[in-house]
Amino acid sequence: MRAPCKRSGEKEEQEEGVAAAAGRLAGAPEAEECSDVDSDSDREMEGIHGPGGLVKDTVYLRSCQAHSGVPASCFLRQVSTPELNLRHHGLGPQGARALASPLTSNPYVKRLDLRDNGLCGAGVEALAGALSKSSTICDVDLSENQMGVVGVQAICAALTVNLTMQKVQLAGNSLEEHAAQYLAELLLAHTGLKSLDLSYNQLTDHAGEILGPALAENTGLTELNISWNHLRGPGAVAFARGLEANIFLRVLDISYNGFGDPGASAVGEALKTNNVLEELNMSNNRISAVGALSLGLGLRVNQTLRILVMSRNPMRGEGCFGVLKSVRDNPMSALELLDFSEIQVDREFDDLASSVKVLLPALHVKTAAHRVEYRKELLPVFTPSLPASVPK
C-alpha cells in the first residue's frame, strides 16, 4: 500500500536525478530499462522520437527541474506514442506537476494511464489543468491515487470543459459522499463521456441520492462501473430510479454494494421501462428471495437485457427459480446469460431451466452446480482509436 500523500523527498537528490537525465539526453543516451510492473505496456524507443522529439524531452526535463521532480524514463520513450503508460511509477504530486506542462501541448497521446502513482489531490489538480486543455487525450486512468475531494473536484471541472474525453477511471480513490456532487455535475455536463469507472470507492447511500437524478438526466454515458461501494437503502433506490429514466446506459455494474430487497425492487421497476440496458451485474447485494421476485417483475417485460449476474446473493434456490420463471414468461426476452454462481438450486430449478432452454435456446444459465461457457460479444461501448501496431 502506498504511503499517505506528502510532499516530495530531499530536493538535492531529486535535482541530481534531473541533472543526470538532462545530461543523458544531451549525449544521446543508451535507453534505460523501464522498471514498471506492467513493463509490457511500455514502448522501448531508441534515440529521438522523430521531428520535435528533442524539444518535447527538453520541455519535460525543464518541467521536472522546475518542480523538483525526478524524470520518468518511460515518459521519454512514450511521449510520441498514442498510449502513455506510467502506472505504478510512484510519481507523486511533484511528478504530476512536471508532467502537466508537456502533456498540455502533446499532439500524440490519446490514452493516459497513471494508475497507482500517489498523485494525491495536489497532483491530480495539476494534471487537471493539462487535461482541460488537451485536444487529443480521450482515455485517462487515475485510479488508486488518493485524490480525495480536492482531486475529484479538479478533475471533474477539467473534464466538464474537455469534450474530447470519452473514458475515465477513478477506481480506488476512497471517494466519499462529498465527491458525489462533483461527479453528478460531470454526468450532467459532459455528453461525450462514454465510460466511467467509480469502483472500489466509499460512495454511500447519500451519494446514491445525488448520483441517481444525475444518471436520469445524463445523455451520453454507455458504461458505468460503481461496484464495491456502499450504496444501500434510500440511496440504492434513488440510483435505481435514475436508471429507470436513463436512455443511454448499456452496461451497468453495481455488484458488491448493499441494494438489498428495496434496491432490487427498484431495479425491477426500472427494467420495466428501460429499453436500452444490455448488461447488469448485481452480485453480492444482500438480495433475498423476496427481492429476486420483485426484480423478476421487470424481467417479465424487458426486451433488451442480455446479461444478468446475480451471484453471491442470499436468494437461495427459491429466488433463482422466481427470476428464471419470469424470464420464461417473457417470449420477447433477449437474455443470453443468467449467472447464479455460488447459489445452490434444487431439482425443480433444473427442470425449469431445461424447459426454458427449449423456449430460449440462446440462454445460458449458470449456478453453483452448473458451470457454463458463455463468450459474450463485446459491446462497442468504447474502442480507443489506436493504430494497429499499438497493443490494446
PLM regions and their residue ranges:
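Leucine-rich tandem repeat or coiled-coil scaffolds
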Residues: 1-392
